[in-house]
């Protein structure tokens, strides 16, 4: 998100929440979406708190420009937060450094192993409220490349996603080079949650979800 603000890359993956800040410089591709289909960022606590109790606590979050934080604000309104690296939130809550944390990425699958409690799944909340998927991440391309090059790059990205879905084992092995040391089963489950047909094309309901979310 920060590098996109500085236009450092021609193509970048960003949080959907951050897109309005870069819309003058970047176009949102119709491929590369990460959307929660009835699941998403989770609020967890080191004890069994109700949502009302949790709202009064300081919440560890992965960033102010993350889609997870926007979903939290939409669901809970104005709350007290502190930003931590996303991979430090779950252990910090488990160790009692924070009462409540907002977890993303593989933490959505591993939180039960850390002895914490689920307070709310914001993907469930969003789906129940809107009937739409929760838009979390997207791919953007820099506008100064020109429409023709932007279109070509978007098509290349789409083809790469289609290829990875056709040969997921090879794609997962390649992706592990940039992984965070999670085990193969967790890695596969997480990828299957967020890389699917909607990653090839948002779909009309996916595009509607982005407009409503922002």
Predicted regions and their residues:
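Short active-site-proximal "capping" loops at secondary-structure junctions
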Residues: 1, 17-21, 33-35
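A residue-level signal for conserved active-site and pocket-lining positions in enzyme catalytic cores
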Residues: 4, 72, 153
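Beta->alpha turn/N-cap motifs
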Residues: 4-20, 85-86, 103-109
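Conserved beta-strand segments of alpha/beta enzyme cores
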Residues: 27, 80-82, 117
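Hydrophobic/proline-rich hinge and linker segments of small-molecule sensing/allosteric domains
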Residues: 28-50, 126-144
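Bilobed "Venus flytrap"/periplasmic-binding protein-like clamshell domains
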Residues: 39-100, 106, 208-212
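Pocket-lining segment of extracytoplasmic ligand-binding domains
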Residues: 86-176
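Secondary-structure end/capping motifs
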Residues: 146-214
């Amino acid at each position: 998100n920060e590098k996109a603000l500085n236009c450092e890359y021609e193509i970048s993956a960003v949080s959907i929440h951050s897109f309005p800040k870069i819309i003058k410089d970047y176009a949102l591709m119709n491929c590369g979406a990460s959307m929660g289909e009835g699941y998403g960022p989770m609020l967890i606590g080191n004890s069994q708190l109700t949502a009302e109790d949790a709202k009064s606590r300081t919440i560890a979050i992965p960033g102010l420009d993350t889609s997870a934080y926007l979903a939290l604000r939409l669901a809970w309104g104005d709350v007290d937060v502190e930003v931590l690296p996303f991979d430090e939130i779950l252990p910090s809550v488990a160790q009692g450094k924070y009462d409540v944390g907002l977890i993303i990425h593989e933490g959505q699958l591993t939180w039960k192993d850390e002895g914490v409690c689920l307070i709310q799944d914001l993907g469930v909340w969003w789906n129940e409220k809107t009937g739409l998927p929760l838009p979390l991440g997207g791919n953007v391309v820099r506008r100064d490349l020109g429409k023709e090059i932007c279109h070509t790059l978007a098509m290349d990205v789409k083809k790469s996603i289609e290829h990875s879905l056709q040969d997921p084992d090879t794609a997962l092995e390649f992706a592990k080079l940039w992984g965070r040391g999670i085990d193969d089963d967790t890695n596969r489950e997480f990828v299957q949650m967020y890389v699917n047909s909607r990653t090839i094309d948002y779909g009309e309901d996916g595009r509607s979800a982005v407009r409503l979310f922002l």
